């Protein structure tokens, strides 16, 4: 079975659209330095490793051959090198010098004072024509020139994958114009670890709250082989959320109570070795958008942040690297 489905719409008042794994938005620094992000959010608990990451360096590439040098160096997408751990910075500089010397290129690395905020990376990348950059090692894509004054439909094409794998999205696209495609330009890859992609205005992402509840409330959900046993022990009802049949838990709890119940469930699960997933869900924009995703027949949801609308969609293919292409009409207008 083949078909095209509308997943929803996005609105991008800034004209700069970011494509990122929605599960990683807790790492997005917005207008702040990435050094302000707690290494614990990266899964780093060792204090020495945390200090190394917190002291990381961003490098700008300067010199007449800068563009060629950074591209052929091949360490990262984009025109800069980001998030180089402090212990590796000197080694990267030395390797770059060797590379330029061997290739006869005139370029050098210069440390960016205070690091480059993620929102600044996106805007600069868009100004340079669009493309990819890294956010703590995760590939992200930014594109500029997106219409600012209207909602843009997000479409997905579905095809049968074969061999019993069922139907999956073959592509997801945002239509910014109606002209015929004259050329295509690869922009880079999105790195996905949470099976979802988010399309968002760069300014809207700067006010995104990933885990902080906007109303002081949270949900606790659990499911799996031991869910019935846990529900009886903890007196948990059906969660009652659309698209989550068989999931147990509580909705709209005060944050301290929700944390207490989630931790109690996790301790019971881990202490007994039972098979069950426990999900703590603060009422944040991330919770709102994922609530829509879980209830959606097409695995997509959206949330308004100011004048912007951001959309999150499940990939239908799990995790991986997903290429992004700008299809241009004869005037050079794009449709990422």
Model-assigned labels for residue ranges:
Residues 2-284:
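Extended, low-hydrophobicity segments enriched in charged/polar residues
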Residues 273-303:
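Compact soluble domain cores
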Residues 295-336:
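C-terminal structured interaction module
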């Amino acid at each position: 079975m083949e078909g095209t489905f509308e997943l929803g719409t996005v609105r991008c008042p800034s004209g700069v659209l970011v494509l990122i794994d929605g599960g990683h938005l807790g790492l997005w620094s917005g207008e702040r330095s990435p050094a302000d992000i707690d290494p614990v959010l990266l899964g780093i608990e060792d204090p020495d490793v945390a200090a190394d990451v917190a002291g990381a360096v961003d490098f700008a590439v300067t010199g007449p051959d800068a563009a060629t040098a950074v591209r052929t160096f091949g360490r990262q997408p984009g025109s800069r090198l980001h998030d180089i751990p402090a212990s590796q910075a000197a080694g990267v500089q030395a390797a770059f010098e060797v590379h330029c010397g061997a290739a006869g290129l005139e370029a050098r690395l210069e440390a960016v004072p205070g690091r480059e905020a993620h929102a600044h990376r996106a805007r600069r990348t868009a100004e340079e024509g669009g493309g990819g950059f890294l956010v703590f090692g995760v590939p992200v894509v930014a594109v500029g020139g997106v219409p600012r004054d209207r909602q843009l439909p997000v479409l997905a094409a579905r095809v049968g994958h074969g061999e019993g794998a069922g139907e999956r999205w073959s592509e997801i696209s945002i239509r910014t114009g109606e002209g015929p495609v004259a050329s295509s330009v690869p922009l880079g890859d999105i790195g996905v670890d949470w099976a979802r992609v988010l399309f968002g205005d760069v300014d809207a992402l700067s006010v995104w709250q990933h885990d902080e509840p906007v109303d002081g409330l949270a949900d606790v959900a659990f499911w799996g082989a031991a869910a019935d046993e846990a529900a009886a022990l903890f007196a948990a009802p059906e969660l009652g959320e659309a698209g989550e049949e068989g999931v147990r838990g509580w909705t709209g709890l005060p944050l301290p109570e929700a944390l207490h119940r989630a931790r109690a469930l996790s301790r019971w699960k881990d202490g007994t070795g039972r098979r069950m997933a426990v999900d703590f869900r603060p009422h944040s924009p991330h919770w709102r958008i994922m609530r829509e995703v879980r209830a959606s027949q097409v695995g997509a949801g959206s949330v308004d942040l100011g004048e912007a609308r951001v959309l999150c969609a499940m990939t239908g293919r799990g995790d991986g690297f997903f290429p992004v292409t700008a299809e241009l009409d004869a005037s050079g207008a794009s449709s990422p």
